[in-house]
Amino acid sequence: MSFYVDITFCLDISSNMERIIDNIKNHISELPEFIQDTYSLEGKTITNMRAKIMTFGNFVEGTPISHSRWFYIKGFDSIHNNKCNKLLVSSISSLSDYESIEFKHFVNNIHLEKNATNTSNGLEALSQAIKSDWISNGEKRRHVIVIYTLNEASKLEESNRTINIYPNDIPVTLKELTDTWIYPPSQTEGLTKASKMLIVCAPQNYPWPEIFEAWDQVTYNPSVKDSFDLFYEDVFNCIFSDI
């Protein structure tokens, strides 16, 4: 049975993340390998795994949502469009090793923005993550969003959509975003009720408890500052609960 895993990490880069950002970056860097290694202990294999990073802050303070490319941690069904240096790849045991190194390098080079508010545009980032170009191959699939923040999210109903860095096609209410998750839009290829998973590392501030209560397929960890080791287990159990 082929098993395909996509993970989109959404990382708040507001300045108040400073005290935990190094732990989070280590967590993100190590999580794909942890998933593979732990799954292999069950005598099973992941056919294809991709990961990408989205960073967000506060639009009012000039921080846009930024997207990385997909990094092919394992398996290369779509690797033909990868523009990596072939000479460098030839010195590494495999292209997946190269991609893992590039992924970790990208994560390590994430820097925080200076800002003065304790709110961020986490809901807009979540909306864009839902619309990721998810892989549609494989007999079994997991499409996972992991969001890290210490902030309350700005309300969609109060967003200033005239700011030039504000993305297009963002829901205008939390209810509309909820519907987008529960009933994925047609352009979101591969995302289904069976494949989707949302993992929230955020405090008990708006809207994270509300999302945990109203959305399906959600794991919520309000103790992101303290529980990284336990969270690894939460992620694994979430991804492989019915595989």
Segment roles from a protein language model:
Residues S2, K44-T47, S136-R141, G190-K193:
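Extracellular/periplasmic catalytic domains that process cell-envelope and extracellular macromolecules
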Residues F3-Y148, A153:
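Von Willebrand factor
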Residues I13-M17, N58-E61, N115, L150-K155, ...:
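Solvent-exposed loop/turn segments at secondary-structure junctions
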Residues N151-F212:
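VWA/integrin I-like adhesion module and closely mimicked acidic/polar interface patches used
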Residues W215-I243:
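C-terminal "exit" segments of structured domains
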